[in-house]
Amino acid sequence: MRSYKLIAPAKINLYLEIIGDRPDGYHELVMILQSIDLADEIEIHSLSSETIHVHCNHPQVPTDKSNLVYRAAELMVTRFPEAFTKHGGVDITVHKHIPVAAGLAGGSTNAAAVLVGIDLLWNLGLTQTELEELGSTLGSDVPFCVAGGTVIATGRGEQLSPLPSLDHIYIVLGKYRSLEVSTAWAYKNYRQEYGSTYLRDTNDLASRAAAVHSGSIVKAIVEKDAVAIAQRLHNDLEKVVLPSYPQVLHLRELLASQPGVIGTMMSGSGPSVFALCETQAQAEQVQQQVRQTIPDEDLELFVTRTITHGIQVVGNG
C-alpha cells in the first residue's frame, strides 16, 4: 500500500482586523498570517477498501465525521469519485504537537495536509490554487495552511496575497491546556460591542482591505525588520477575549515584561499568546523565566520560529 508522511505547521496572526459583516454570516477580515515550525505529523496510507479511517494520539481530538481531517478526506472522495474507486480509501494518522483549540489553526493545517496527501496518493496532479480552493470549502484557514509562509488574508480569510516570507524570528508560545475560547463567542461578542464601527459599503470594505498592502506592518515585513513588525502587531479580538479571560491577559503581560521580548499578542481568538524575540537564546530564556514564574503544569510553553512554507511532504512509501 502506498503512503505519505506530511508536516503540517501551525500559524499565528501577526495582524487581525475586523472590518465588517458578510452575507454568509462570517466577518470581513484583514489579516497577516504566519507559519511557524510547531507542527503536527500526518501519515496517509492507501486502503484496498473504499473507506476512510482516522486515528489521533490526542484524546481530545475526535476521529469521526466531526473532525476536519475526516471531512477533508470526504471532500476528496466526493470531488474525485473515480480516483477513489481506482485507488481505494485512506487511513490517516494524526500525531498532534500543536495545542488543541488554541487559535493556531491545528485542525485546518491537518485538513490541508490531507488534501495534499490524497492529491499525491491518487495522482490527481492538482495545483496549489486548486488545493486552496478545495480548502476554502472546509474552513477559512485551510487555504493559508496549504500555502504557508507569510500572507495577507482578506475576505473571511480565504483570499490570499503572499508576502516576502519571514524566517527565523523566534517565538515563545504559551497556552493553558484546559482553557478554550470559542471562536464563535469571540466574534459574536466583538460584533455586539463594536459592530457599530463596521464598514457597510462594498467599496469602503474593498478599500480598507487593500490598504493593508501599503501599511506600516507590511513595509516592516518586506524590510524583514523584526522590531518594527513586533511594534505593529494587532488583534481586534483581544478587546473582547482579554477582559473575559484573566489568565490569558496575565500571560500576555508577563511575556511582554520579559527582557528580550520585542512584541506580544494573542493569536486568533486565543487563548494562545506569543512573544517575539530576535534570537533563539532570548526566546529560551523567556520560556525558562515564565516557567519559573508560573509553574502550573497546565501551561504549555513552546519555543518556535517563523518559517517560509506550508504543508511539506517528508516521506513516502
UniProtKB/Swiss-Prot annotation:
**Documented EC number(s):** 2.7.1.148
Q: Which InterPro entries match?
A: GHMP_kinase_C_dom, GHMP_kinase_C_sf, GHMP_kinase_N_dom, IspE, Ribosomal_Su5_D2-typ_SF, Ribsml_uS5_D2-typ_fold_subgr
**Active site annotation, chain numbering:** K11, D141
Q: Name one Pfam family in it.
A: GHMP_kinases_N
Query: What are the record keywords, sorted?
Result: ATP-binding, Isoprene biosynthesis, Kinase, Nucleotide-binding, Transferase
Q: State a single Gene Ontology molecular function.
A: ATP binding
Where is ATP bound in this sequence?
P99, V100, A101, A102, G103, L104, A105, G106, G107, S108, T109
Pathway involvement of the protein, from the record: Isoprenoid biosynthesis; isopentenyl diphosphate biosynthesis via DXP pathway; isopentenyl diphosphate from 1-deoxy-D-xylulose 5-phosphate: step 3/6
Quickly give the catalysed reaction: 4-CDP-2-C-methyl-D-erythritol + ATP = 4-CDP-2-C-methyl-D-erythritol 2-phosphate + ADP + H(+)
Q: Name one GO biological process term.
A: isopentenyl diphosphate biosynthetic process, methylerythritol 4-phosphate pathway
What family does the Swiss-Prot or TrEMBL record give for this protein?
Belongs to the GHMP kinase family. IspE subfamily.
* Its job: Catalyzes the phosphorylation of the position 2 hydroxy group of 4-diphosphocytidyl-2C-methyl-D-erythritol.
Which protein are we looking at? 4-diphosphocytidyl-2-C-methyl-D-erythritol kinase
- Origin organism of this chain? Nostoc sp. (strain PCC 7120 / SAG 25.82 / UTEX 2576)
